[in-house]
C-alpha cells in the first residue's frame, strides 16, 4: 500500500466539523423569543451558514476517506 500522510486531511476534516458545530450553535442561539422580521432573517442567514459548513465538512470527510482507501486498499 502507499505511504500517504493522511494527517493533514484529518486535521482539515476536524476543523471543518468544528466550524459546522459552531454554526449550528450560532443558529440555535438565534432561535429566541424575538419574533421580529430582523431576528427571523438573521436566523435564516445562520441556517444558510449551517448548510454551507455542513457541505464543507462532508467534502473534507470524503477527501480524508478517499485518502484512507488509497492508503489501505490501493485505490
Residue ranges and their predicted role:
Residues 47-56:
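Short, highly charge-biased, low-complexity peptide segments
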Amino acid at each position: 500500500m502507499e505511504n500517504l500522510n493522511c494527517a493533514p486531511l484529518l486535521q482539515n476534516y476536524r476543523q471543518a466539523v468544528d466550524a459546522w458545530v459552531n454554526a449550528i450553535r450560532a443558529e440555535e442561539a438565534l432561535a429566541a423569543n424575538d419574533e421580529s422580521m430582523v431576528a427571523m432573517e438573521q436566523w435564516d442567514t445562520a441556517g444558510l451558514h449551517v448548510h454551507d459548513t455542513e457541505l464543507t465538512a462532508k467534502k473534507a470527510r470524503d477527501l480524508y476517506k478517499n485518502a484512507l482507501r488509497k492508503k489501505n486498499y490501493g485505490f
